[in-house]
Amino acid sequence: MRATSKFHYLNQFHPGVWVATALLALNAFVWNSVRDWRGWRIHWGWPAGGWVPVLVALGVGLVVQARDGRGDAIYRERGFYGIIKISEFSLEGDDFRLLLNGRITHGYQFTEAEASGRVTTYYGPPTGVGLAVQYFPLEENATGGLRVGVGGLGVGTLAGYAGKGDYYRMYEINPQVVNLSSLEVGTFTYLLQAKERGAKVEVVLGDARLSMEEELRADKPQGFHVLALDAFSSDAIPVHLLTKESVAIYLKHLDPKGVL
């Protein structure tokens, strides 16, 4: 079941507010050196113009705080990997729910039941990963369905392709994201719907490369038909996922005809 009733509202102060507070504290403890006919004299006081940067920083922080706190955010939580926020929007008659980490979108899902299983963003049917998952040529005598690995869970969008007998293994480093997209208590329901269609879905909490490396050490290659890597946020590229050594790890997890 969707845990929409379990949203919790956390008012997070924008960094600008904290900067302003720090400036106020700093000003309060600045010692001014004033020279007069008696020589140097030190006393407590506010330096000339000290209020100006304080008021500017405080004003900017409060304006941004007010903007970010508008009603579209139904969930907000700060964690080790930044602020996770869920917003709800309506566009051209469609309602959808959006997951953001800072200012980076990690996927969205339509909220209406009829459209909630629709694969969105850059995972759609005409995209590279969409084509690979939809048209991978399974052997006629294959005993199981499609095996798909995903580095970076997001809202679980790729599970929208999962059918009966398929196996989807998702690797995600951020426990907040796992909680919001998991089968048991997820706000986003791609994984739950995949399970209801008869697919098996497992979420591995941890760094994708390290987790796959541990699986190889345990002699558990996954035999993925498709392995998709999308563990990237803005310009902070996790280079360790793109090295020659990491690619060698991925290839060992692929079926002989698998697609990376």
Region annotations inferred by a language model:
Residues 1-260:
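Alpha-helical transmembrane segments of multi-pass membrane proteins
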